[in-house]
Amino acid sequence: MMNIAIFSFTKNGSCLNVRLMDILKQNNILSYTLPKYMIDDRMTALINLKETVEAHFTDDAIIFIGATGIAIRSISPYVKDKFSDPAVMVIDELGRYVIPLLSGHVGGANELAEYIGGAINATPVITTATDINGVFAVDVFAKKYNLIISSRKLAKDVSAALLDKEPVDIDSDIIEIDVSDIKKKLNPTDVKCELRVRITDKIYESNVLTLIPKSIYIGVGCKKDTDAKEMLDFVNEVFISFGIDIRAIKSIGSIDIKKNEKAINELAKSLSVPFLTFSKEELNAVEGEFNESEFVRKTVGVGNVCERAVLIQCKKLILGKIARGGMTIAIGRD
């Protein structure tokens, strides 16, 4: 479900606005128009366009029904980059053309424009180079598989090379993401390429564009009032030493008595991942051989928190407990 704001400014535009509310009804829609054109109870009176657009710039999509100039002037103070901007599009009031303006790929504006165009019998005006040339788009691929793009610059370099019909090598360490057919298209003669793309949660050379899946889960523990920076540095160092990209972390787990531990909460916040906690009963119920500590067992009721917390979150423990300065970590992968 998407959060979508729709703006219209004329009588014809308001009629199309209502049509779009019905077409996109599976989403969370907020519809705005001038007070004199409110023809549906679902509409909200548009009093201040600039303030309303600003309030919706964290939405998934913004649709303007009217002139392109109105849309551009309305959004210009808030535009940042294609990785954070919402999908923004313009539709003329007669519903003839649907024009994506921002976030055609990452934000999904092109895809939404195609969908709306089909629904109202309008022509989507797609201007993205990779789309109109039928070229593999890194950002579209990454979005489809929920992958993190390691370098925006390298992503641009890859797109530019493909548009210039230069070969690019691509491989995947992830069984579920098969790129064999894509590899044949991007590098049909299997030559050594200057530009390489790798779908992986491992750390590669800085000149390789990695597309990183959220495939890693960690379990952690620490003594009370551990310094937050010390905790983050510890986790960073462990990941670097074992060649795992820290951006691949999907969630962090620990025992429930640590739910308010500042160091772990700050770690989760800095990595933008959820912090999950489990009771001692849940942790003790996990089967397997673990690096147990009698001191920890007497203190919290579980002989090993981090390894057990990993295996509640995922299937496989790939790195057993590592301890330093009252902190522990274990790592798993789906």
For every predicted segment, state its role.
Residues M1-I6:
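Extreme N-terminal starter segment of soluble prokaryotic enzymes
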Residues L30-Y32, V125, P274-F278:
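General small-molecule cofactor/ligand-binding pocket signal
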